[in-house]
């Protein structure tokens, strides 16, 4: 009886291993690839002035034209683990994000979205300022993210998610340049 039990258990284990291997292949599931997007803009102002115009974590509404009502929920500006919330103008969309790292000397910060009703997930972004060749500065904005669902609606596929992030970056970078062109 014990030998029979061991044989059945071994067959079940082999079958379970085969099932796990089958389900872990890309063809067996609709994977959500990690998407990447980056953009930059050259600004006439020196790096410090440009950095000062967008570095305050709970003041995104002062430089991004699509946002309003930013408030700090946890922590302090310029300190890791600070959490902010802001709304998107003209609707009920919101974003709650967490500051992961901030470096005043290097003019750089990293953040992640922890909750949103926008159609994206697992978003981690970075913003930085560098000196531009010949004067001025360059603002670099990059992010990794995923579409919200494994089997997305047509308007929430990878291309739509990338287009959303591209629009957010363009509007923000263009406004940073406008604020620093004087």
Residue locations for each model-derived region?
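Hydrophobic ligand-binding cavity/cleft-lining segments
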Residues: 26-76
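A conserved amphipathic terminal alpha-helix motif
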Residues: 138, 144-182
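Bacterial N-terminal signal peptides that target proteins for export
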Residues: 2-15
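Amphipathic hydrophobic-ligand
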Residues: 33, 119-126
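A short, structured loop/turn motif at beta-sheet edges
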Residues: 46-48, 100-107, 128-138, 182
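A mature extracytoplasmic/lumenal domain signature
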Residues: 56, 64, 90, 101-103, ...
